[in-house]
Amino acid sequence: MGWQRLGAAALQVIDRYVDDGVIMSFSRHISRRRKPDVDTLIRGVCAGQRSHLAMAITLVESRAPKHRRLAHELMQRILPHTGGALRVGLTGVPGAGKSTFIEALGMSLCAQGKKVAVLAVDPSSSIHGGSILGDKTRMEDLARHANAFIRPSPSGNSLGGVTARTREALLLCEAAGYDVVLVETVGVGQSETEVRTMTDFFLLLQIAGAGDELQGIKKGVIELADAIVVNKADGDNQRKAELAKVEYSRILNFLHSFTPGWQPQALSCSALEGDGIDHVWALVLKFRDEMTASGVFERRRREQNVDWFHALLQQAVMQRFTESNRERIQALEDAVGRGEVPVSMALSELLP
């Protein structure tokens, strides 16, 4: 059967049995042949077909002008179908067991009949390499589950780009009917702040004895967290993990909560053994219920939409200004590099 004759039944088979990473490359292949239109993508996404969801995300990630027009149309029409998922951001120090934790939590939620999407964000990596794809291959069981979808989110060299593309991917996952969207960041750089601005609940995963308590405070990551979970609380490490949980609880009591009306808590778990995962999720649900009742939940989402608008506005203005003044900027850049013009004077010439 030729690619152009590939029907809905075949797509459903692929959707069920093929890992989403394969679907990504598959979708790129057939997009050159079949070129599904926006109507087809919307129908497929809203029907919960992972193959169409992967193609839709690939479209919104594209920087090609012809694709951006289609992406804008797609997002505009998909918007009424979004907003129904619980958005959870997750970060942690290297070696904290993020992949194991996400898989344990995801499999637990899938067992409850929930649909779970995982978006992995790494500003230091591209979609073709780095720790994202390594994490993804360690979540094989979750990636194969019919109720799960795992997608690395490329970043290029711009944190603003990370925010824009990941937000759009998140909305597409909601339109596809996913109940929970987990947005993972590797725990380095400024990506935690970016992910915090697009999620409802932000979870910091730690391990005992890593010496990261004060380092975390310096980075400002702990202040962003709605909960700290000490992972690997098993075997000989269980006592150290419990002591670390007590220490983090003490630290949290002295810090200002990022979420008004919520006192962040510290928990412990063993993602490897599956112990404590249910307690973590129960805390997330408690947060959702309390913040919904107080109005903080809805207010935060409105504020996040406005913040997103301003971030994209700044990015668009900067891009348009750079494109329209490319030669002038290059000349001043060369002069600054040679030490002929002070940086402040170069800026004043560009922005009189």
Language-model regions, residue ranges each:
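Canonical P-loop GTPase G-domain recognition
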Residues: 234-288
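Conserved C-terminal guanine-recognition region of P-loop GTPase G domains, centered on the G4
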Residues: 189-197, 210-258
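Nucleotide-state-sensitive switch-loop elements of NTP-binding domains
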Residues: 37-85, 96, 105-191, 198-205, ...
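Hydrophobic positions on the alpha1 helix immediately C-terminal to the Walker A/P-loop
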Residues: 101
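Non-catalytic terminal/linker segments enriched in charged/polar, low-complexity residues
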Residues: 3-80, 330-331, 347-352
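Long, well-ordered amphipathic alpha-helical subdomains in the mid-to-C-terminal portions
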Residues: 53-55, 268, 279-352
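Hydrophobic anchor at the beta1->P-loop junction of P-loop NTPases
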Residues: 88-90
